[in-house]
Each structure stands twice: as structure tokens, then as C-alpha cells.
Amino acid sequence: MSMNSSKQPVSPAAGLIANTTCQTENRLSVFFSIIFMTVGILSNSLAIAILMKAYQRFRQKSKASFLLLASGLVITDFFGHLINGGIAVFVYASDKDWIRFDQSNILCSIFGISMVFSGLCPLFLGSAMAIERCIGVTNPIFHSTKITSKHVKMILSGVCMFAVFVAVLPILGHRDYQIQASRTWCFYNTEHIEDWEDRFYLLFFSFLGLLALGVSFSCNAVTGVTLLRVKFRSQQHRQGRSHHLEMIIQLLAIMCVSCVCWSPFLVTMANIAINGNNSPVTCETTLFALRMATWNQILDPWVYILLRKAVLRNLYKLASRCCGVNIISLHIWELSSIKNSLKVAAISESPAAEKESQQASSEAGL
């Protein structure tokens, strides 16, 4: 199969320059791109430091696997800001003249691969985190004995490799990534849908993203319900409530941020794939949906920066003082692991625990 696009590298940019209907202000866009990239890099760097410190603290506990996956997600967001933001700033600074600086279409391909990878990989990792927490809450004994850091690292590597495969799939199929109508970013072909393959890449991307969001929503719902049931049924194990509350708030925040930021872009890509050249989606709509998606990489780290136990405790105290409510005893914020409380509750209700208690009592009688 011959690659016509590689023989005529100028045509992708040339066609868009001639027919562009979506323009952006260069100076303003460069300024905002630099601000977005800087804030994203600093936020993710701070979140990485916090998560790594927490991982060292909980290395031997059930929360370590959650922190390891969360660190992978934030690191992915960090490199997404670094690579995509750096290329975007360069494109704006070069007056979006792709013919001059990317005649071979190499930079556009790198940009497109990075966009797909940095978009799907955090969604996949968010789903993996939701599944891991769901198992850890609903079956804590299995989680603590069978799911080790080695397994989590293998899952993390597998998720990243699959995201890389999806990102390079068009290149393997001899399809170049295309410069979009705004001439500021590269992605799958969205302007002139030619055949089923163009539709497939867009639908596949949207399907995987929406599937990841659906899995996260389902698992987080099960996790939240289970934690609430444990909280109300096991009042004697009050020391675990701090991590219960911290986990519920973080999981809900991650899910809400991902859904709000990514749903418009995923639905927009699916709409373009289904309707093809007759799609009512405009360049401005696509660009707005893309900017919404990029906010996910900025907001993700703040979930782990702000929604920590120490911060929530201070916010609770501040809110109580502002509202004039007496601060109740904050025993719910005592240091403990969710593993301990859930494991005690699970063991106390299991048949094996009853047998062990009977054996212990018989031995004591002897």
C-alpha cells in the first residue's frame, strides 16, 4: 500500500490554510497556552510530590495500590501538558504556518499521537483506580492478600501500552494524523471523512473514552454504597471513617471532573464520525470541547491536592466556625487505614471467623 500523504507532505496543511473558517487570535492564544501549560505542570508536579510521599507512608497498606495508580495518572497528565503544551506554544509562536515547519508531517503525527495517548490513558487509569477501590472495599481480604504492588505495576504498564497502541493505530494503518481546521492541533481526520476507516478511528476513540467513564461511574457507585453500608452497620469501628470519607470524596470528584470535561469532546467526535461530512459540528464547537478536555488535566491533580484528609479537616473546622456551630469531637479524623476497618468488619461476619473463635474458646476451656 502506497502512502500518498508521505509523498505529498504539503497537502494536509495547504488544504486547511485555503479553507480555514476557524481562526484564533495568536497573541492571546500564545499567552493562554503558556499559562495553561505552566499551571498544569506546576499542579501536577505538586500532586506527584504529595502522592509519592503518601505512597511511601502507605507502602505496605491497601491504600498503596490506589496511590500507585493515582501517581501514574498524574504523571501522565504532567507529560501531556509538557508535550502537548510545548507543541501548541510552538505552533502559535510560528504563526501556525505548518507548511514552513512541518513539511514532512512528522510533528503533526507526534502531536496527534500525544493527544490520543494523553486523552485515553488518564481515563483508563481512572477506571483502573475505580475497579481497584471497588475490589478493595467490597472484598478487602482478597484485595489485601492477592493484589500486590507488583500486580498493580503490571496493570499500570498494560494500560499505558494499550493507550500507546490505540494512539499509533492510524500510523500502523498508513493514515496520517491531520491538522485540524483551527490549525492549532492535530487529531484524526474530522474535516473530510473519506471512508469507514476515518469513521472507525473516531468511533473507537469515543467508545473507549465513554466506556472508561461508564466503568468508573459504575464502580464508584458500588464503592460509595458499600462504604456507607459499612459505616452505618459497623459503628463500633469508628476509627476508619476518615479514610471512608476521604475515599468517597476523591472518587466522586475524579468521576465528576472526568465526566464534565471529557463528555463533550467524546460526544463531539462520535457525532462527527456518525454524520461524516454532514455533521452539524462546527470548528468552534470542536475547539471548545477540546479546551474542556484539557481542563481535566489541570483539575485532576487538585483532587489529590485539596481533597486530602488534612485539608478537609481544616475546611470542616473553618465551616463550623463560620456557621457558628460547635465543633464536635473529631474522632472521625484519627489516623487509620480503610483496610483495617473494612477487614475487621468483613472478618467478623465471615464463617471462618466464627470457626476460629469457637476453636479459641474450646482451647481456652481445655
Swiss-Prot record:
Top-level taxonomic group: Eukaryota
GO CC aspect terms: cytoplasm; extracellular region; plasma membrane
Keywords: Cell membrane, Disulfide bond, G-protein coupled receptor, Glycoprotein, Membrane, Receptor, Transducer, Transmembrane, Transmembrane helix
Intervals, Extracellular compartment: 1-31, 91-109, 176-198, 268-285
Cellular compartment(s): Cell membrane
CDD domains recorded: 7tmA_FP
Membrane topology value: Multi-pass membrane protein
Transmembrane spans: 32-55, 70-90, 110-131, 153-175, 199-224, 251-267, 286-307
S-S bridge residues: C108-C186
GO biological process: cellular response to prostaglandin D stimulus; negative regulation of apoptotic process; positive regulation of cell population proliferation; positive regulation of gene expression; response to estradiol; response to lipopolysaccharide
Glycosylation sites: N4, N19
PANTHER family, alphabetized: G-PROTEIN COUPLED RECEPTOR FAMILY 1 MEMBER, PROSTAGLANDIN F2-ALPHA RECEPTOR
Family according to the record: Belongs to the G-protein coupled receptor 1 family.
Protein name: Prostaglandin F2-alpha receptor
Organism: Mus musculus (Mouse)
